[in-house]
Amino acid sequence: MKKHWIAVDWGTTNFRAFLLNEQQVIASVAQPCGLLTLSKDAFAATLHQHLAPWLTELGALPIVMAGMVGSQQGWQEVPYVAAPANAVKLRKNALPLSTPWGSPAWIVPGVSSASAYGLPDVMRGEEVQLLGLNALHPAHEHHAILPGTHSKHALLRKGEITHFSTLMTGELFSLLSQHSLLGRALPEQQDNSTAFVEGVLTANAGIPFNHLIFSARTRRLNGEIALSAVHSYLSGLLIGYELSTMSAEKESWVVGSPSLCERYLLAAQALDIPLRTADGDTCFLRGMAAFYAQLPETHA
């Protein structure tokens, strides 16, 4: 197995690649060339363009890709793997690709599952972070939150993703703050932890959701929250409502960027929910390394 290899996180809006020596990151590149900006026949050329300096220096390195690159709108669709899923199962169902320059490449499949509420659910990319979390912090069971546009609440047992539920927290915030009455005619917004926590606590008062979010307007109108803190309050409402589904008796992990983890940790503290944080990039790379370790010696 080659020591040098490339891990790629290719999503809807962004492309990120990491050059690794086994598990150590040597270099990285990030570009705003997600799948929404590319036609089907442009993926190979785009990939080569951004990896060219590494390929020139080190040759046709193995490439492992994860994320929406394997969706219907991506380079090639890779069918979801049904939970329970671990690194071995993901490897067996990965899609091998031939690149024009000779690098062996694979796209990691996403995972499908019934949610905690019995509805169908899917993820692409987050499965890698979950496997990385388990590799970094081995335990019989993990309850994990992966915040973002579509936040995932997942359960892992014995290193396998057993089931998960998607909550559209990030996308709802974007829609409500940018395209609804709640975000209209606001001054420049400032982070306000007091308003955020007030939103978190309000969201856990048993108020119907459609009524709850309207308080981002009425509390602004009556002066209970500053005009510059509406986004902080709205964020608190949405994250607080998301966390209302969690048990205060079980410790959970939040896996993501430092800024998002800090926000979720603040909300959890306000609700007395035990929560630990893990860096999303670190978990992603460790999960990709777990996948890479499963590849046949003759290819990697």
What are these regions (language model features)?
Residues W5-A42:
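Short glycine-rich, Thr/Ser-proximal phosphate-binding strand/loop in the N-terminal lobe
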Residues G59-S71, G148, I239, K250-P258:
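Short glycine-rich phosphate-binding loop at a beta-alpha junction
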Residues T56-P120:
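Short beta-strand-loop/turn "lid" adjacent to the catalytic site in phosphate-handling enzymes
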Residues L38, V111-P147, K152, L156-G206:
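Glycine-rich phosphate-binding loop plus the immediately following alpha-helix
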Residues V8-N14, M68, I145-H150, T169, ...:
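A short acidic Gly-Thr/Ser loop motif
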Residues F15, L20, L181-A300:
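ATP-binding/phosphotransfer module of carbohydrate and carboxylate kinases, centering on a glycine-rich
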Residues Q49-P62, L243-K250:
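Phosphate/pyrophosphate-binding loops at sites that engage ATP/ADP/AMP, CoA/4′-phosphopantetheine
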Residues N21-Q24, W101, L155-E160:
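Short acidic-glycine loop/turn motifs at beta-strand connectors
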